[in-house]
Amino acid sequence: MGILNRRSIGIVSIALFALALFASPAAAAKKTFQDSDDAKEANEPAKFLPDYDKLTKGKDADWVYFPDGSLKKYRTVEVKEFVENGKGREARHAAEAGKEYMEQWLEKAGYKLAEKGAELVIEGNVFNAWEPGTGARIWGGWMANPGVGLEVVAKDSSGKVVGEIRHKTRGSTIDDAVENALEEVAEAISDGR
């Protein structure tokens, strides 16, 4: 083995060690909502969920917190009417569609709907809903689509919070954006992540 090969192996070994040393803490730390750009949006109130500081990056939804893990153990669910703390008629319109779409997607996920006495109670809030401006519509693209930002709290029958979700998405209309968002929220509820 020549001297050049020994140096190459040594340099590569040191580089891999340094990479492992510096990359592992960054990979181990979960990204939290409070440290994200989403938390800094001035026009998107963060006043509905009890624990914004515990939200972490989710698999199906943007930000999630499930203190006890998966919610699959709950079989019956009651969905309350959604509220809105976002500004404008778009947020009100999105909140009006929330309950129906949440029920639809939870039912598809295998939950049984109940009017009262359910094992799981879902409350929702629309913190932002928007229609793109005329310029965006002319230029097109995904950013030209309407969107919605919503939050969901899941409580057990005793009122204990068992899940919190904050999620934003887009669609061809505000209603479509609400449906898309709540489909992903229902998947997050079912998976517990």
Label every model-predicted segment.
Residues 12-21:
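Bacterial N-terminal signal peptides
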Residues 23-25:
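N-terminal signal peptide c-region/cleavage motif recognized by signal peptidases
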Residues 27-100, 193:
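A structural "domain/chain start" motif
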Residues 78-79, 162-164:
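Structural recognition of the beta-strand scaffold that forms the well-ordered cores
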